[in-house]
Amino acid sequence: MRNWRWLLLVLAVLLAWLQYRFWFGPGNSGEVMMLEAQVAHQTQDNEGLRQRNQALAAEVKDLKDGEAAIEERARSELGMIKPGETFYRVVEDAPLPAPASAEASAPAQQAPEPVDPVDHP
């Protein structure tokens, strides 16, 4: 009977020691959770960089293979045109400022200016 008590005591101490190492020792559960979060964050970063690399690789391939991409870039970034083409720049008018009150939005009636019938040299 006494042997059982010693065995039970040894098992309880062993369990307590293992629990202490699990919660507070090196490689404890808090560190594991922190490392898992870092791995998830790094995985997201890697996926974004992988997509960026694929887009850059596609752009490089297009620039190497296709003349259309080179032409589009020369037109948009360098302002180049083909021989015989005419370049037109469309400039939009700036919007008029909104009137300050409702009275200002009503059309003002002005008398026409008198016409001078005398011919000036």
UniProtKB/Swiss-Prot annotation:
Its membrane topology: Single-pass type II membrane protein
One cellular component (GO) term of this entry: cell division site
GO biological process: FtsZ-dependent cytokinesis
Stretches with biased composition (Low complexity): 99-113
Superkingdom assignment: Bacteria
Residue ranges crossing the lipid bilayer per the database entry: 7-24
Residue ranges, Periplasmic side: 25-121
Ranges where the record places region Disordered: 98-121
Keyword vocabulary terms for this entry: Cell cycle, Cell division, Cell inner membrane, Cell membrane, Coiled coil, Membrane, Transmembrane, Transmembrane helix
Disulphide bridges, residue numbers: none
Keyword Glycosyltransferase tagged: no
Coiled-coil regions listed in the entry: 31-66
Signal peptide extent: none
Subcellular compartments: Cell inner membrane
Cytoplasmic topology ranges: 1-6
Similarity section: Belongs to the FtsB family.
Record-linked HAMAP family: FtsB
Protein function: Essential cell division protein. May link together the upstream cell division proteins, which are predominantly cytoplasmic, with the downstream cell division proteins, which are predominantly periplasmic.
Assembly description: Part of a complex composed of FtsB, FtsL and FtsQ.
Protein name (record): Cell division protein FtsB
Organism: Xanthomonas axonopodis pv. citri (strain 306)
Gene (UniProt): ftsB
